[in-house]
């Protein structure tokens, strides 16, 4: 009924927001790693 529809929507929203947060974290790690690699290549310290 109404509750199961609402429950599904809420679970879906939680999953989506969770995935977005994970994506941000992973994205930041990738960016940081990329900057580190670029920095050591510029300095010639890789």
UniProtKB/Swiss-Prot annotation:
Expressed by the skin glands. One of its GO terms (cellular component) is extracellular region. InterPro entries: Antimicrobial_frog_2. GO terms for biological process: defense response to Gram-negative bacterium; defense response to Gram-positive bacterium; positive regulation of insulin secretion. Coiled coil: none annotated. Disulfide bonds join 40-46. It is found in: Secreted. Its main location: secreted. Keywords: Amphibian defense peptide, Antibiotic, Antimicrobial, Disulfide bond, Secreted. Antimicrobial peptide. Stimulates insulin release by BRIN-BD11 cells in vitro. Belongs to the frog skin active peptide (FSAP) family. Esculentin subfamily. This is Esculentin-1.
